[in-house]
């Protein structure tokens, strides 16, 4: 087999470029990518169903001046976050042309020559940039993916070798898209406050208003033996809220519901929104962050962009006061967000292990 092109990671390790690997004629899948020996639930062949699907929430209905319409949609949102932890958001008001442009620009980025993409590679001690995060050792199993991760807000924390160096018009398109995602996340947080009937005025939105926003572009190449690999290891998101846009209609995202995996069929131009660990902590377990994973296709690539919306670094994170009562005692510890973030970044992706660490 030809020698694969290597990508240098921020921790000094190097891994093969799976996008370049996928272009080769592979007699067998390299052992570092195979999922043999995984727990039965994490095996690719574990029970997967297409019979159920995540709820669909209509933002126009949520914001409707008609009280009955708004209340019905708000109840649907509450149920979706409580029972599923995921929903698809439609009629969200984000311009269709902007969505088309961001899809085209991201595809263009991943199609750049490798020497162009590695200009944005991870630097020593950093997870941001082009590569693959959460790799801790030479013998760790690898996901069948390549990503470009970047902290986008607040502006003063942007890395000078990443966002400012992106080529035009990609940089301008991405800037516009991320701005829209920030505004959209604020609206969703406001609706979640309303659905929880919080006593605290802006008890949730104040924490996230000037908080961190991280972007992650995902590329999942085709794999000749998709049943042997994972595009993304099963995990729950650390964030408060995640908003994901699929760039094509290739399925691959699956969420865990009890002992089954449910495939999400992305609706055209809908956003897939999910509750993160921080939001589960803040709601004292009312809203649930849910394990999810990505599987890959034998012939088609899959691309997506996710934005993760978090609190300010100096914020104290813990269950919201009015959601802690003698009947519903605090389920999670409190902590400074920056310290909690460092703890999370020191871990590899592993189900809901971070939330287990935060439990009382």
From Swiss-Prot:
GO terms for molecular function: codeine O-demethylase activity; metal ion binding; methyltransferase activity; thebaine 6-O-demethylase activity. Its EC number is 1.14.11.32, 1.14.11.31. 2-oxoglutarate binds at residues 220, 302, 304. Fe cation binds at residues 235, 237, 292. Mainly expressed in stems, capsules and leaves and, to a lower extent, in roots. It catalyses: codeine + 2-oxoglutarate + O2 = morphine + formaldehyde + succinate + CO2; thebaine + 2-oxoglutarate + O2 = oripavine + formaldehyde + succinate + CO2; (S)-scoulerine + 2-oxoglutarate + O2 = (S)-3-O-demethylscoulerine + formaldehyde + succinate + CO2; thebaine + 2-oxoglutarate + O2 = neopinone + formaldehyde + succinate + CO2. It comes from the Eukaryota. Disruption phenotype: Accumulation of upstream metabolites, such as codeine, thebaine, codeinone and neopine, but reduced production of morphine and oripavine. Lower levels of sanguinarine and 1-benzylisoquinoline laudanosine and, to some extent, of noscapine and papaverine in roots but increased accumulation of the protopine alkaloids cryptopine, protopine, O-demethylcryptopine and allocryptopine, and of the protoberberines sinactine, N-methystylopine, N-methylcanadine and rhoeadine N-methylporphyroxine. Its cofactor is L-ascorbate; Fe cation. Pathway: Alkaloid biosynthesis; morphine biosynthesis. Moderate substrate inhibition. Not inhibited in vitro by acylcyclohexanediones. Residues 211-311 form the Fe2OG dioxygenase domain. Non-heme dioxygenase involved in biosynthesis of morphinan-type benzylisoquinoline and opiate alkaloids natural products. Mediates the conversion of codeine to morphine. Also catalyzes, with lower efficiency, the 3-O-demethylation of thebaine to oripavine and of (S)-scoulerine to 3-O-demethylscoulerine. Supports, with a lower turnover, the conversion of codeinone to morphinone, of thebaine to neopinone, and of neopine to neomorphine. This is Codeine O-demethylase. It comes from Papaver somniferum (Opium poppy). The gene is CODM.
